[in-house]
């Protein structure tokens, strides 16, 4: 890929703007509307919060000055927020965001449900879970002690992530100085970036943005080593998706030197993949394959952010470029409207990051037409999951659908940033794209092809022995 600067214009972060005084609302008296069930993984996740901690979704909306999930969705979709959304200053923003995590990790009590003699206080070790009294904390300690250390990292990362949103944290970039085949995991990637990486991190640690970030939080700034580790984890979280796509290309030996460029589809894309996405976020994919003639990455899903919605071009790409675009639709509908009509080229690879079809009948129903389409058209497909348990469950679904599994296992480019299960804080944190599965076509069809290749041709001509 041709070298170019990563210092581009950054999109505005969510508003931190003056707003009218709004009196505190009793969340128990006014219950903001929750979304209707559907194929949106964002909506399903939001609904699930209420089953784990009754009243938590309403608490989140209330602290963000919102009346419904639709208003919340409008913000994470990149749309224009309602007038009531906003914060007087950065300090208030962090305070209100932290308020959305305030519930007793043991008895699940929310602030409005506490008696006057109780108050929620956080664990002093991790600063990430809350308890309404010492008895709940003691009762919860056997479970919490197993994850307290990791949750401390989560709490730091949650603050540091704001530097990505504001654009103050610019990831090191540029053509790889090492041979691509030498970069097999994060250790080799970090070694390759070497001095460039350390220079970037040290400059940010000493920056005014870092100072103001922790000053607005009103709590002590962690040691430099802690912040350094957090920045590296955040970096892997951003780069995990493009490098995991590269893993799929390597595994399937896809030709990236195809005239006109290669087409990659990210299906089931949500705000996780598309919110505040920037044009250079997938440049690392191009550097992974310096011989590429261009990558066209199209994100398809009902939760694709408005920032990414744009028409995808079928025109040939400039060699070494990565073009990002998005379509808000279910993939099988997108296929009928764009691929079958010839508007867009067939994909060289389809990827689904955490599709979750194993988790609920509703998601499986939404995913089934897409999975069958990918199988029947023999489209090279990569999916990722959070855990070994999800890997096994997803493999079982794919085996039941008679897909031909090519490879699966631990992802060498998994995110190193631990993710807290929002409404179950003592559940073991997970890591994005920790495991992967690659499949193509139908398993029984592959067996049939193999048998045909092994059987002798009944109509082959056998030459007579001249002797």
UniProtKB/Swiss-Prot annotation:
<feature type="binding site">
    <location>
        <position position="136"/>
    </location>
    <ligand>
        <name>Zn(2+) 1</name>
    </ligand>
</feature>
<feature type="compositionally biased region" description="Pro residues">
    <location>
        <begin position="14"/>
        <end position="23"/>
    </location>
</feature>
<dbReference type="GO" id="GO:0008270">
    <property type="term" value="F:zinc ion binding"/>
</dbReference>
<dbReference type="InterPro" id="IPR052839">
    <property type="entry name" value="Mito_gene_expr_regulator"/>
</dbReference>
<feature type="binding site">
    <location>
        <position position="107"/>
    </location>
    <ligand>
        <name>Zn(2+) 1</name>
    </ligand>
</feature>
<keyword id="KW-0479">Metal-binding</keyword>
<feature type="binding site">
    <location>
        <position position="123"/>
    </location>
    <ligand>
        <name>Zn(2+) 2</name>
    </ligand>
</feature>
<feature type="binding site">
    <location>
        <position position="144"/>
    </location>
    <ligand>
        <name>Zn(2+) 2</name>
    </ligand>
</feature>
<protein>
    <recommendedName>
        <fullName>Putative protein MSS51 homolog, mitochondrial</fullName>
    </recommendedName>
</protein>
<feature type="binding site">
    <location>
        <position position="126"/>
    </location>
    <ligand>
        <name>Zn(2+) 2</name>
    </ligand>
</feature>
<keyword id="KW-0863">Zinc-finger</keyword>
<dbReference type="Pfam" id="PF01753">
    <property type="entry name" value="zf-MYND"/>
</dbReference>
<dbReference type="InterPro" id="IPR002893">
    <property type="entry name" value="Znf_MYND"/>
</dbReference>
<feature type="binding site">
    <location>
        <position position="132"/>
    </location>
    <ligand>
        <name>Zn(2+) 1</name>
    </ligand>
</feature>
<feature type="zinc finger region" description="MYND-type">
    <location>
        <begin position="104"/>
        <end position="148"/>
    </location>
</feature>
<feature type="compositionally biased region" description="Basic residues">
    <location>
        <begin position="1"/>
        <end position="13"/>
    </location>
</feature>
<dbReference type="Pfam" id="PF20179">
    <property type="entry name" value="MSS51_C"/>
</dbReference>
<dbReference type="InterPro" id="IPR046824">
    <property type="entry name" value="Mss51-like_C"/>
</dbReference>
<keyword id="KW-0862">Zinc</keyword>
<feature type="region of interest" description="Disordered">
    <location>
        <begin position="1"/>
        <end position="34"/>
    </location>
</feature>
<feature type="binding site">
    <location>
        <position position="148"/>
    </location>
    <ligand>
        <name>Zn(2+) 2</name>
    </ligand>
</feature>
<feature type="binding site">
    <location>
        <position position="104"/>
    </location>
    <ligand>
        <name>Zn(2+) 1</name>
    </ligand>
</feature>
